[in-house]
Amino acid sequence: MAQLETRTEPMVVNFGPHHPSMHGVLRLVVTLDGENVIDCEPVIGYLHRGMEKIAENRTNVMYVPYVSRMDYAAGMFYEAIVVNAPERLANIPVPKRASYIRVLMLELNRIANHLLWLGPFLADVGAQTPFFYIFREREMIYDLWEAATGQRLINNNFFRIGGVACDLPYGWLEKCIDFCDWFGPKIDEYEKLITNNPIFKKRIEGLGTIQRDQAINWSLSGPMLRASGVSWDLRKVDSYECYDDFDWQIASEKEGDCYARYRVRVEEMRQSLSIIRQACKMIPGGPTENLEAQRMVTEDKKSEIFGIDYQYVAKKVAPTFKIPNGELYTRLESGKGEIGVFIQGNNEVTPWRFKIRAADLNNLQILPHILKGAKIADIMAILGSIDVIMGSVDR
């Protein structure tokens, strides 16, 4: 008796570019064999706005407000890297107090970034409840930003060459510590609700596994790299700002799957809380009004309270500040991974070349590789675990 052969033809399906699970205007051209993914081609560029070319036609002071719109979940990180590049090229010192203020803002942004990742990721895999919890804590971070910078989510325009735009308002550090006291138990609450949930674990464990060598060869960074067993964090490696002053650990896992990436991000929020607590206690000068009062009553003009480390900016940079001749690449660790800037100056007020390295663009490149062999229902979970914001991918 002759056996019948079953032939299946591949089917091409378009995901996006306008879909709630695409995390922006990302289009995936997916080739399916039944429910199995056999190929995937990401199509990017829908949100390209020419940010690098804009940088080459703006002074640094004019360009800082632009960059928080690239990645609305990591605005402070992009502000920091945009001022760090000319600072290092021109050897401009940063006061210790300003560096501590920067660290406070960056770590608050890291927590906000991971919270904004956590809620939609859980919604993608079917857990709706925590999606509403994370915005409660994010609002508290927005309130802290609003008190210090005047803006909430984006366009904080707070970082400056040589420091920050203004000092922290009186009472801000106490409010920041209050937030830490509130948020610490909330992370425990998230973990009780999510981490050992059998449905959640069964849904994402073993999905999108990336081996250690693959993570290195694909130039992954951030939680994507650390979840594959590579303890690499630029805050430890490059020791930029004042991270060497604090006692904290690199969060890493070995499994390399979606669940490991979740565990890394949750642990990073705990470590960021620890850094914020230490920075609030160790910041030179303490609360602003106390610092100003000490300056007024100090008769000895040589007192350290008048030193550079107690200022919030080394020197107000003029709009005519010229970027010196030379080139360099500088980088920092954002919530998504390594973001960097290659700057080339020619002694003009605008840079001759300003190349931006976005962490999520590099991390997104491995998506077709880890999707092959997965089920169509797992595409959203794997994509969600990468954490992409298309504004910074396309720039």
UniProtKB/Swiss-Prot annotation:
List its EC numbers: 7.1.1.-
Q: Where in the cell is it found?
A: Cellular thylakoid membrane
Q: What is its main location?
A: membrane
Catalytic activity annotated for this protein?
Answer: a plastoquinone + NADH + (n+1) H(+)(in) = a plastoquinol + NAD(+) + n H(+)(out); a plastoquinone + NADPH + (n+1) H(+)(in) = a plastoquinol + NADP(+) + n H(+)(out)
The record's annotation in SUPFAM superfamilies points to: HydB/Nqo4-like (SSF56762)
In terms of InterPro entries, this protein maps to: NADH_Q_OxRdtase_suD, NADH_UbQ_OxRdtase_49kDa_CS, NDH1_su_D/H, NiFe-Hase_large
**Lineage: superkingdom:** Bacteria
Alphabetically ordered keywords of this record: Membrane, NAD, NADP, Plastoquinone, Quinone, Thylakoid, Translocase, Transport
Q: Name one GO molecular function term.
A: oxidoreductase activity, acting on NAD(P)H, quinone or similar compound as acceptor
Bilayer topology: Peripheral membrane protein
GO BP terms, alphabetized? photosynthesis, light reaction
- What's an example GO cellular component term for this entry? plasma membrane-derived thylakoid membrane
Q: How does it assemble?
A: NDH-1 can be composed of about 15 different subunits; different subcomplexes with different compositions have been identified which probably have different functions.
State what this protein does: NDH-1 shuttles electrons from an unknown electron donor, via FMN and iron-sulfur (Fe-S) centers, to quinones in the respiratory and/or the photosynthetic chain. The immediate electron acceptor for the enzyme in this species is believed to be plastoquinone. Couples the redox reaction to proton translocation, and thus conserves the redox energy in a proton gradient. Cyanobacterial NDH-1 also plays a role in inorganic carbon-concentration.
Q: Which PANTHER family match?
A: NADH DEHYDROGENASE [UBIQUINONE] IRON-SULFUR PROTEIN 2, MITOCHONDRIAL (PTHR11993:SF10), NADH-UBIQUINONE OXIDOREDUCTASE 49 KDA SUBUNIT (PTHR11993)
The UniProt entry's sequence similarity note says: Belongs to the complex I 49 kDa subunit family.
Protein name, per record: NAD(P)H-quinone oxidoreductase subunit H
| The organism of origin for this protein | Prochlorococcus marinus (strain AS9601)
